[in-house]
Amino acid sequence: MKTLKDLGDLKGKRVLVRADFNVPLDGTTITDDGRIKAALPTIKALREQGAKVILMAHLGRPKGKVVPELSLAPVAARLGELLGITVPLAADTYGEDAQAKVAAMSDGDVVLLQNVRFNPEETSKDPEERAAYAKKIAALGEVFVSDGFGVVHRAQGSNYDVAADLPAAAGLLVEKEVKALSRATVNPERPLTVVLGGSKVSDKLGVIDNLLDKANRLVIGGGMAYTFLKAKGYEVGTSLLEEDQIETVKGYMERAEKNGVELVLPTDVVINPVFPKSDEDIAPEVVAADAIPADKMGLDIGPESQKLFHDKIVDSKTVVWNGPMGVFEVPTFAEGTKAVAQALVDATAAGAFTIVGGGDSASAVRNLGFPEDGFSHISTGGGASLEFLEGKELPGLKVLD
């Protein structure tokens, strides 16, 4: 994979950078700027070389239409604050305003192009349509840097097709992500423990499938655990359950046993009569995992499971965690996720290499107040890090070879 140093002298060059600025918004307020901060090392490195930095990114799912609420204006403002400069936002992605703003740039300037997904061609399934659109974007730059790890698992105009039109390389963030995830999947220090949570087994099938041949231990929590408990013959009440995955999960359990992979499931859970919409809905109780009443649902792992998971995680040299242990947005059901985060922090302090997979786990870690340097690596890519762990070839990385 080509990296920044393979691009040579970039002084005065127009460098197109595909970043990942898909940040959560509350109105026009950014509630977690982690992804913007993650892009700063590449932006600063290019500015120091005297490059003209042209940033592009998507926000939300505007489905190829201009949706004013999904403008990158809040991102341009936050970038300006973090860099201590003005970052102009072009009114379009490759049209007259983008061209004018790029033409007015001096060395070291930064410009942000408007949301690439305002253009239907960006996510088109027609390669020719995407390629023609990518050429229009590529005309703005002389070199392409791919630094949006959150989108490398997709073949889209601004991260895949543009790379065919310009000399292309990975930015510092993508390089860091690939190094970290490779360290967990290629000859990892053992024991390798993989902790999976989140709501659906179906989202993680490929990961489980691949890791049953690689990991020493799989720890399963979150909503997906109830399908595993059901496959063991337990009743799960009204908990989240994927009936159509029970046979698959039984197969995984058999394979784990055959491969000598330790499969760790919750031994107790925190239950509630309903999925909590507000504080009034909460009447939690802790029961054994094989004693969930018919009219209650599991919403977090219980205290015994928290200790069990903690001990298994700390007894590892490499840990990968993807997906929360419960409904962490509600404080009553956040204890399991907190316990796993704390276990990773403890494992890191004891010398283990730890990765927090992107998406919900990364948000949970930040929202629950854990220090970012408590973990070896917090990934910025949810789907991308999962597909990397599945052993899939990621199109956005392949084009950088």
Curated annotation (Swiss-Prot):
Tell me which residues bind substrate: 20-22, 35, 58-61, 117, 154
Compartments, as annotated in UniProt: Cytoplasm
PANTHER family this protein is in? PHOSPHOGLYCERATE KINASE, PHOSPHOGLYCERATE KINASE 1, CHLOROPLASTIC-RELATED
Quote the pathway field: Carbohydrate degradation; glycolysis; pyruvate from D-glyceraldehyde 3-phosphate: step 2/5
User: Organism source for this protein?
Assistant: Bifidobacterium adolescentis (strain ATCC 15703 / DSM 20083 / NCTC 11814 / E194a)
Q: Keywords in UniProt for this one?
A: ATP-binding, Cytoplasm, Glycolysis, Kinase, Nucleotide-binding, Transferase
Please give the family membership noted in the entry: Belongs to the phosphoglycerate kinase family.
Which GO terms of type biological process are on file? gluconeogenesis; glycolytic process
Annotated protein name in UniProt: Phosphoglycerate kinase
